[in-house]
């Protein structure tokens, strides 16, 4: 099986696919900017995956089925999305937001390709920053009084079963998608991360997180390794030169705001609703 993945490992849905590929021991190529075909159809939406040079697909739950995992039920997928609440706080500190994204290393072995992609990747980060703030301004999402509540359905489910993972003796779609959410929360720490660490009601969730981190101890895209046991190293960064290229690109995006901002909204309209 030949797999090409477009995406950045800050996305929970990209993480779910990468975790699935790692679990199945399937080699893949990861690119940090969208292929032209993907850009024309879906903008910068991620992940996008092509299997054996077939058509690109963007629904992570469906991609996991193609990789050999059982489908996730609609109500479970909704519970995964509920656990993603709080994502809007990623942009509370713009400097931290851009600094953390600058550390996402492109995987190409070619210096020229890495440099080009890290420059262009700055637009995707600019897009994400604009999108999150646009949603905050228009929808004005309210913080819950208790961030831990969004995990209680998972806690109850885990406590009622005997297996190490939600889907049995090995991780399945529910495990991969939910663990992807945790990676997103940990990549730029947001308020929903804290109850996973210390809420007395979420003992089972911490046991599950420990099981996942042991299972994926050699997974190269894990951000939660600094927050839960056993500890796992953070993803390897791109190096100072490539970070500098990213920030040069980011400065260019802001300098060209009359062009880049309208482009962001054009690409937003391509995202399926």
PLM feature spans:
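Membrane-penetrating hydrophobic segments
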Residues: 238-251
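Juxtamembrane amphipathic/hinge helix adjacent to a transmembrane helix
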Residues: 149, 193-241
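GST-like domain detector, emphasizing the conserved glutathione-binding G-site
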Residues: 1-122, 166, 248-273
């Amino acid at each position: 099986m030949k797999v090409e993945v477009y995406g950045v490992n800050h996305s929970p849905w990209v993480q779910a696919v990468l975790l699935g590929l790692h679990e199945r021991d399937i080699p893949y190529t990861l690119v940090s900017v969208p292929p032209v075909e993907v850009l024309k159809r879906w903008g910068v939406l991620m992940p996008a995956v092509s299997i054996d040079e077939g058509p690109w697909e963007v629904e992570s739950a469906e991609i996991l089925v193609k990789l050999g995992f059982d489908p996730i039920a609609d109500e479970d997928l909704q519970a995964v999305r509920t656990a993603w609440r709080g994502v809007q706080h990623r942009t509370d500190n713009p400097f931290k937001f851009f600094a953390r994204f600058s550390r996402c290393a492109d995987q190409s072995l070619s210096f020229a390709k890495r440099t080009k992609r890290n420059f262009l990747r700055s637009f995707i980060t600019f897009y994400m920053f604009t999108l999150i703030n646009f949603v905050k301004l228009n929808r004005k999402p309210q913080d819950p009084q208790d961030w831990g509540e969004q995990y209680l359905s998972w806690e109850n489910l885990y406590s009622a079963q005997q297996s190490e993972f939600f889907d049995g003796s090995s991780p399945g779609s529910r495990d991969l998608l939910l663990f992807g959410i945790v990676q997103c929360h940990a990549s730029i720490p947001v308020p929903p991360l804290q109850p996973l660490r210390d809420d007395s009601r979420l003992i089972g969730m911490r046991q599950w997180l420990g099981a996942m981190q042991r299972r994926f101890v050699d997974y190269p895209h894990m951000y939660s390794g600094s927050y839960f046991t056993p500890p796992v190293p953070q993803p390897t960064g791109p190096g100072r030169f490539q970070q500098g290229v990213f920030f040069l690109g980011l400065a260019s995006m802001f300098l060209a705001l009359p062009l880049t901002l309208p482009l962001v909204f054009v690409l937003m309209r391509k995202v399926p609703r």
